[in-house]
């Protein structure tokens, strides 16, 4: 025997281990899940977040370890959480965080945790909405709390919190927080813990016979909290803290004194407050320092507790200072935010094998969000993959012999070969050229332009970069992919020339026939250069107004060997003997791992990072050696020379180098009226866009204008633009250095008026320090057409680290920004005159301050206003209406938040409508679900009368918007609203079809009106006519998403030609998730040869005080034989439909006498049963509590019993049956009337048996909306709710229960 018991126990433990769920890392589940048999263990450092699983039933022990978490959350307004652990053999142990949060749901939630033991050493949170009565029970036999238990409701209802098994005991050494909750004590309370009442909460000691420890503490935190104790002869003393400011302490009986004692007394020495009902009294240790004159007898009428008239005492004074016990000092924390309840996104990498067998790695962004209905969905965006390919090289021989009016002798020897690679996301174009440049030539560089496509490359090394958009939370970051370049192993160029010109560029370049690119300058002077593809510097740009900067850096470290340069000049000519050898190569490329985020205010910020350069002197010289950051230019040129042709090819993106801004400073040694300047060339660019990649080619030349004997030093370390000066003595006006123009693609973010972020991309042209958006790529959605102009200031960081502030006019159209003009920097020279747009403030004669804008001319330091722009609007004639929320201070000093419709005319605001205050529904901060619902509000007219209006209101967070307003209601019955409805028709000879049409609602009846909808499917519409339901052949397309929904079920029973069978109709109306308009049922008896039985029915719907809706139906025969009346409620249920082992769930709102929340239906034609006269009835598989309608044979008289839960059972005669009877019982038809739950029997042949049209009663309270009508036979199904949305015990559960019961029997 002992051995057998041990075997059973071992099998039970093994079963738990097999089905156990162990969580060792963070996990998020959304939607319905089923917890099988077994324990649940969440290990340290892991969390499990279950979202929108309405029914959660733990069937094993629950163990949450330290620093672990279990979160069960509902984000649905319709379905609240139902969490249970109902087995008595398992325990609950929490050392981490357990949170059950259903605050957003508008239905009642239920938390029922039992088990053999309950131990909480961590934090547990239980949240409900409070719109309807919710229940919370932690009723384990062994109960202990040393941590935090928090019970929260948005508003107080009659629901209560129960702790421990009734008549048992609990041990509380921690903190128990109540917020808008009622704790009802039914056990002994041991320990030295604390009960804290916040908001509208009450601590109700319902059974004083069960002792409460003298070390237990009760803390009332504000004026809405209270404590009520049962008035019995057993007197106890309760430690109460925080009593005062109007909160209450009372008994369950009115406070009545005796001739010896008053109704209450306060001992100022001991601090004991005694409350009495004659001989019954209870004592409260509230502490000392209270003034007896401020005590007052009041009534505590909170819901969920006994409301005793004048049974409580309030103290209308401040709470005297008193030290709280340690347990009451544990803070009552808010309910934590569950992981996964907010829309989120993250980057993921996917590795897979393609068809060629190669491993391909893809990167993308996974976005998890919700739609308007609150349903979760996932979107994955994969970044394009960078692919490269190198083809076989080709050889090309090229020779150049150019001449111009100014000849520069050049001794050149070059042997250059390089490979060109263009990498794109889909294809690659490769060209390799071997270029031979003649030894001697006369070169004159002229500006040209060329275009580089993806299949043709002119030049040497081509750099391809790919732009990847990584989306993260409301903004977009442009990140640059790695740059790949391919060049020949030997790359050497030798040039001899007599001039050095300066060109500023730090992006990847390649060599043309007449120039050499070395780092950030191009030289055709006398020096030897060997170069290898320098990488580009980086920049970042932020457009005005709340944008995000991405700073990326890819900085090559360059080592350069620089020779000596000697120059001699005179006043009449320039002579030079310059030798400037240079050897440059990339020694290291460093790249920052993370982008930097900066948020400026209405500024454009440009950060330029220059390559790190190290120099090495290789030859001595009597002249000072130049720093690598400076280049001596134009040492042998005495006339206008065109030189230094540059061709640039690159794929531009946000990290494009801004060295092409050419913000160079000119150090000018000026003598008398002569001066020298350098004009940087204006590059021409041609771009092609392919696969989100912009490939551009620039060609430019530098034009050097000179008239003097002085040298010009172009210092790249001083990037400070200066304005162009005009001199009459100059032979040719020199343009300022900022004339260099470049084009590149950029991505920026803009903040819309509603606070959302919009990411845009486009082509930006830059001339000097001026930015112009040439083209904006089309956004994914239509942006705003509003165009505004404003003045913005931005800063530019020079190569030497200095910061330059610039200002200009920026135009904004929607989310597109364009720089219209850049203001020149201020100058002390009085001859410089500039015009710009500015904004200023003026003080009117009445002292008010007005803001104006206009065109301002600046001459030196003098400012003159040329023109003033008109104001944005003449204001007063522009009238707009919008929904707004504001706060109002009442006469008692309290602050009330109100919402309504506000009209604005100019700067004047007028409140048109104030919305009705909404019941307290605290929506968590993480909720971003938009909802639409029907609401009613009041409006005060000009004559002071109040008009009630209704309409559809859209809510996004705490913002309310009125979508439409319903026509005013009228007492006249002729006014019948119309709405689009959809219903389902099922019959015995065809499958269910769905139809929609315009339904007219008058009082509580629904009729179809003529519709112009286009026919979509072939079906039937039911219309009443002379107590007989007929069908017409027409159909309609579906209605809009805001339409109410009407579901109609129609069944046609089997009938012969001699019998007129009517359809059996049930109508269900559910317009939205928060409102129900009406529900009614239509049923008519048949006309048969033995007589007609007709019924009439009236339905009324009432709005109850608690906000729920109920429907009262009255049904009677036409001839008045019987009359029934029943009152039903609108109930929300989850329907699980099963076909054998396949089940699916559906949530409906229906009318029922009982508040069923879980209903299961099924159908099978395999099994039949025969009762009495062999009328077949269907047995439904896998459905519990199935009932078959018996058919009784009576040759003389047939009676029916009308079942009504509100009235007594009665019997009435229906019809005589002397002429017709049943012969062929196999062809009989039976179907169920969904209104009064009676069975309609139809006979098709005559004989001895039962009469046509007989009603048989089913003693069932199953909701009529979900009962099924079958053919040729049907049975009524009654179900009982079960955990996790199922009404059946699985085979595994049955086996397990049998095993446990059998084991217990053996032990006993």
From Swiss-Prot:
Topology versus the membrane: Lipid-anchor; GPI-anchor
Keyword Methyltransferase appears in the UniProt entry: no
Pro-piece positions: 1285-1308
GPI-anchor amidated asparagine lipid modification positions: 1284
Ranges for region Disordered: 487-506
InterPro entries: Cell_wall_rpt (IPR031573), Hyphal-reg_cell_wall_N (IPR021031)
Encoding gene (name): IFF5
Name this polypeptide is given: Cell wall protein IFF5
Entry's Gene Ontology cellular component terms: cell surface; extracellular region; fungal-type cell wall; side of membrane
Primary role: GPI-anchored cell wall protein involved in cell wall organization, hyphal growth, as well as in host-fungal interaction and virulence.
Induction (free text): Expression is down-regulated in absence of GOA1.
Domain of life: Eukaryota
Major site of localization recorded for this protein: secreted
